[in-house]
Amino acid sequence: MDFILNLLPFIVNGLSLGLLFALIALGFMLIIGVMELINLAHGSLFALGAYLAMVVISPHFPWLGAFGTWYLGLPIVLRYVLAVVMAPALVAVVGMVLEVCMRPTYGKDPLYGLLLTFGAALVIEEAIRVVWGSAEQMLEVPQ
């Protein structure tokens, strides 16, 4: 019985990670099916959303000043709810800008769209690396 109880967190973590991968793959296939364009920036946009959610949950940037002090006083559960709402909205704005940049490639050779989204992925990943660094990040966990 102890073996099953010790194994349960690993099963839950594995299932949640598998569902996350399935969500990313479904989004990727939806973009390919609807737009007929291979969007290589899809994973980078997902990573950007994760980092933006991290900022909403625990803002640790000095430029926030007094707002950061006030914001950290909010309950952690409320900050998680705000992250679920704000991070996808912010990434949607970035995705809209990317879509406007991709419009000239519609109806042309698919290589143009492929190169554009590959370049966008490199730019987004480098922006993440410049702003947050390449070290692992920590988050507060609600109790």
Residue ranges and their predicted role:
Residues 1-35, 40-143:
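Small-residue-rich transmembrane alpha-helical segments that form helix-helix packing/gating elements
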